[in-house]
Regions:
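A structural signal for small-residue-enriched, beta-sheet-centric alpha/beta enzyme cores
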Residues: 1-116
Length: 116
């Protein structure tokens, strides 16, 4: 992600969280499940985020999901992940074993928490 403004360290950290939330939302909406426990996935072993900002640009003070910058970052992450998975649908994410409806994932999470 390339931001045309300056993000101080705290804002950059929040931007990374907001980007991760957008990515996770896309994975959940697509029904991608964690291969180890069947719960809705929040990432993959191959994903990562690079955030580049302009130290000479406009200074941003917030990148949370309710700020304009955060909303744009979240939307960019969501659409990028969704488009990539829909365009490059490979066997690893096409298997019915890797897809789970959200309710099933919640039930599995409850069962796992009851075992602890």
């Amino acid at each position: 992600i390339i931001a045309s403004g300056f993000l101080p360290e705290g804002v950059m950290a929040r931007a990374l969280i907001t980007l991760t939330e957008g990515k996770s939302a896309a994975l959940q909406d697509l029904g991608i499940a964690d291969v180890n426990n069947g719960l809705p996935a929040t990432g993959t072993c191959t994903d990562g985020i690079t955030l580049i900002c302009d130290p000479e640009g406009k200074k941003y003070t917030d990148a949370g999901s309710f700020s304009l910058l955060g909303s744009l970052l979240s939307k960019a992450a969501y659409e990028s992940v969704r488009d990539c998975i829909e365009t490059y649908d490979h066997p690893w994410n096409a298997s019915s074993l890797l897809r789970t409806p959200p309710a099933q994932g919640i039930d599995r999470l409850r069962k796992l928490s009851e075992k602890s």
